[in-house]
Design a protein with these regions (language model features):
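S-adenosyl-L-methionine
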Residues: 2-73, 81-84, 88-89, 101-139
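A short SAM/SAH-binding and catalytic strip from SAM-dependent methyltransferases
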Residues: 137-153
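Active-site capping/gating segments
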Residues: 178-223
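Conserved beta-strand signature within the Rossmann-like core of class I S-adenosyl-L-methionine
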Residues: 162-176
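A short glycine-rich, Lys/Arg-flanked "PGG" loop and its adjoining helix->strand segment in the class I
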Residues: 154-164
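Conserved glycine-rich SAM-binding loop
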Residues: 78
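Conserved SAM-binding motif I beta-strand of class I
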Residues: 92-98
Length: 223
C-alpha cells in the first residue's frame, strides 16, 4: 500500500472509531464480550506485507479467536470456504447465496502453512436465495464479506433479531441509500448502525483491498 493510500485508510479507521464511541454511554470497551468470551481488539498489522488472497482464512482465524462457536449466516458466501472452515472449527454455518456453488477442491492453511484438500463429497448448508432480514431469526451472527446489496439489510436484521454481525462493506451496489458526497461508505454505514442503537467496532485484517470491517456483538451481550 502506498503512503497516500495508507494515510487515507488510517484516517478512515480513526473516523470509524470515533463514530463507534458515540454508541450508548460513549464507551464500548465494557461490552466487548460474546457468549462469555472477551473480544480482543485486533492488533494493527498494517506494517506487515499484505496478503493478496486468503481473506476467508484470515477472517476465519479472527472469528474463532474473538467469538465462541455459534450459528452463522455466511451471506453472499459464494463457494462456502468460510462456512467450511467454521464448521471444521465446531460452528454451525450456512451459506445464503442465490447462486449455489461447489466448495473449492483445496485451500491454503495459513496457520500450518500447507495446502489442504477438501473431500469431494463435502458440502456446506446452503440457502439458495437473496438474503432477507427474516433469515436472521435462525442465526446468532451475520457475516457479510463484501456482500453486495446486503450491508444495510444485515444491520437492520441485527437490530430486529438481536444478532451480532461482521461486515466488510465494499461497493455501494443495490443498497437502499448512498453516502453523502465526501462521506465514505463505511462511515455512512457505521453512523447508520450507531443511530439504530448498535454498539460496533472497526477492525482490520491483513489482506489487500478493502480490509476494514465493522462488527457488533450479540444484542443479548450488550444489555
Amino acid at each position: 500500500m502506498g503512503s497516500r493510500a495508507k494515510r487515507r485508510s488510517d484516517q478512515l479507521f480513526e473516523t470509524l472509531e470515533t463514530i463507534s464511541t458515540r454508541a450508548h454511554d460513549q464507551n464500548t470497551d465494557d461490552i466487548l464480550a460474546v457468549r462469555g468470551q472477551d473480544v480482543q481488539v485486533v492488533p494493527d498489522s498494517t506494517h506487515l506485507p499484505r496478503m493478496k488472497k486468503f481473506r476467508f482464512q484470515l477472517l476465519h482465524q479472527w472469528l474463532i479467536h474473538n467469538f465462541s462457536p455459534c450459528r452463522v449466516a455466511d451471506i453472499g458466501g459464494g463457494k462456502g470456504l468460510l462456512s467450511h472452515l467454521l464448521i471444521e472449527s465446531g460452528w454451525q454455518a450456512t451459506v445464503i447465496d442465490p447462486i449455489p456453488q461447489e466448495l473449492p477442491t483445496k485451500y491454503k492453511d495459513i496457520v500450518l502453512g500447507r495446502r489442504v484438500k477438501i473431500d469431494l463429497k463435502a458440502r456446506v448448508p446452503n440457502i439458495p436465495a437473496e438474503f432477507d432480514t427474516r433469515h436472521a431469526n435462525y442465526f446468532d451472527l451475520l457475516i457479510g464479506m463484501h456482500a453486495h446489496g446486503c450491508n444495510v439489510k444485515i444491520i437492520d436484521a441485527a437490530v430486529e433479531y438481536g444478532c451480532g454481525f461482521v461486515i466488510f462493506p465494499c461497493c455501494v451496489i443495490d443498497e437502499p441509500f448512498y453516502p453523502p458526497l465526501g462521506v465514505h461508505w463505511l462511515e455512512s454505514l457505521a453512523d447508520y448502525a450507531v443511530r439504530l442503537g448498535i454498539v460496533l467496532k472497526p477492525f482490520r485484517l491483513n489482506f489487500k483491498g478493502q480490509n476494514i470491517g465493522l462488527y457488533a456483538p450479540l444484542k443479548s451481550q450488550q444489555e
